[in-house]
Design a protein with these regions (language model features):
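Extracellular-loop-to-transmembrane junctions of the mid-late helices
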Residues: 1-10, 103-157, 184-200, 308-310
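Transmembrane helix-loop junctions and nearby membrane-interface residues
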Residues: 20-23, 45-52, 75, 81, ...
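Interfacial "cap-and-anchor" motif at the non-cytosolic start of specific transmembrane alpha-helices
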Residues: 2, 12, 42, 164-270, ...
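Alpha-helical transmembrane segments of multi-pass integral membrane proteins
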Residues: 20-43, 95, 133-189, 225-241, ...
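Helix-loop junctions on the outward
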Residues: 35, 39-66, 80, 110-122, ...
Length: 310
């Protein structure tokens, strides 16, 4: 089962790269949606290979870092697709609400408010948390439920007001909204041996990207001035660097397998940042010889990163 989580995590990280390459306009909510899915699925994988309770709890915190803000980013994208004007005060309030919820969901091992008790067990080739829910655990269900109702309500409102006129766009939007809801509801009533939401997140990404690209080609996106791509790129780099070092710190002193995996993840992130920067600079260079030197320099830097990691 750990192998399945590992494959899903790699696919999620790859989807972030696909999103950056596919979205030349750098839509901030779209990028953060893909990043949150990658963070969540990476947390699931790290949890599945954890050997100690502390490592499992830290991995669970990484998973919640992605899953807590994922509904918010998805709601922002649905709002864009439905051509509903955003309200800065409501957006700020939702971000603050997410921060509070993140504090609650990452409290296990510190406070008994989300889980009263928590331990780990090894079953099916993976590590799982054995927990007794605390008094504030129900708040997370309420949090998710409100987001789900908001997304469904926005979608139905947009269809009724003919803000979404294409049958294909309607189908993709409804599928993206309902996909996670259906999987989440099924998981509540069936024995959960596997986090099927990790798979549904990737399906949702594919649907969102298909819808986004289709609407973009038809000129239905970016009715408002779009943010600076440079600013988004800088924020993405800062986030990825912080995330990479967070993974390295959390896995420090754990099992050899986790040590190797964490370094591979960090290496992928560093190389991704380097390649993105190189491509950006390469496009701005006219002289062929300077381009050649840039490619050689990037190759040497990637080789150095690989040797340093090994």
């Amino acid at each position: 089962m750990s192998l399945a989580y590992g494959i899903i995590a790699i696919i999620s990280l790859s989807m972030v790269g696909i999103c950056v390459l596919a979205d030349k306009k750098r839509d901030e909510w779209l990028i953060w949606l893909f990043v949150s899915v990658a963070v969540c699925n990476l947390g699931y994988f790290m949890l599945s290979v954890s050997k100690e309770l502390d490592a499992a709890l830290n991995s669970n915190r990484i998973a919640y870092l992605g899953s807590v803000f994922l509904p918010f980013f998805l709601l922002m994208m649905v709002q864009r697709f439905c051509k509903i004007k955003s309200n800065k005060k409501i957006t700020t309030l939702l971000i603050l609400l997410g921060v509070v919820m993140l504090g609650i969901t990452t409290s296990p091992g510190i406070l008994p408010i989300y889980y009263k008790t928590v331990d780990i067990e090894f079953a099916g080739g993976a590590t799982k948390l054995v927990r007794e829910y605390g008094p504030l655990h129900m708040l997370y269900y309420v949090y998710l439920g409100l987001y789900m109702l908001s997304m469904v309500g926005m979608t139905l409102f947009a269809i009724a007001k003919k803000k979404v006129t294409s049958h294909l766009h309607t189908f993709l939007l409804l599928s993206a909204v309902l996909c996670n809801i259906v999987i989440w509801l099924v998981e509540q009533f069936l024995p959960r041996g596997f986090e099927w939401l990790s798979v549904s997140y990737i399906l949702t990404e594919c649907l969102i990207l298909m819808l986004y690209r289709s609407m973009q080609r038809q000129g239905l996106m970016f009715n408002k001035p779009r943010p600076s791509s440079y600013t988004i790129d800088v924020l993405m780099v800062i986030f990825l660097l912080l995330f990479a070092n967070c993974v390295r710190i959390i896995t420090k002193g754990t099992t050899p397998t986790m040590y190797v995996i964490s370094h591979i993840v960090v290496l992928i992130i560093y190389i991704g940042i380097l390649v993105s920067w190189g491509m950006s600079v390469y496009d701005r260079i006219v002289h062929k010889s300077i381009r050649r030197y840039l490619v050689i320099l990037m190759g040497l830097m990637m080789f150095w990163m690989l040797m340093r990691t090994l």
